[in-house]
Amino acid sequence: RKRHPDCDKAADTRI
């Protein structure tokens, strides 16, 4: 996935 670091982080942790 190619997105901003913040968005990528949120998507990766997606609680």
Swiss-Prot record:
<keyword id="KW-1015">Disulfide bond</keyword>
<keyword id="KW-0964">Secreted</keyword>
<protein>
    <recommendedName>
        <fullName>Kunitz-type serine protease inhibitor homolog T1-1 B chain</fullName>
    </recommendedName>
</protein>
<dbReference type="GO" id="GO:0090729">
    <property type="term" value="F:toxin activity"/>
</dbReference>
<comment type="subunit">
    <text>Heterodimer; disulfide-linked. The A chains have phospholipase A2 activity and the B chains show homology with the basic protease inhibitors.</text>
</comment>
<keyword id="KW-0638">Presynaptic neurotoxin</keyword>
<feature type="domain" description="BPTI/Kunitz inhibitor">
    <location>
        <begin position="1"/>
        <end position="15"/>
    </location>
</feature>
<keyword id="KW-0528">Neurotoxin</keyword>
<comment type="similarity">
    <text>Belongs to the venom Kunitz-type family.</text>
</comment>
<comment type="function">
    <text>Neurotoxin T1-1 is a presynaptic neurotoxin of the venom that exhibits indirect hemolytic activity against human erythrocytes. The B chain is homologous to venom basic protease inhibitors but has no protease inhibitor activity and is non-toxic.</text>
</comment>
<keyword id="KW-0800">Toxin</keyword>
<dbReference type="GO" id="GO:0005576">
    <property type="term" value="C:extracellular region"/>
</dbReference>
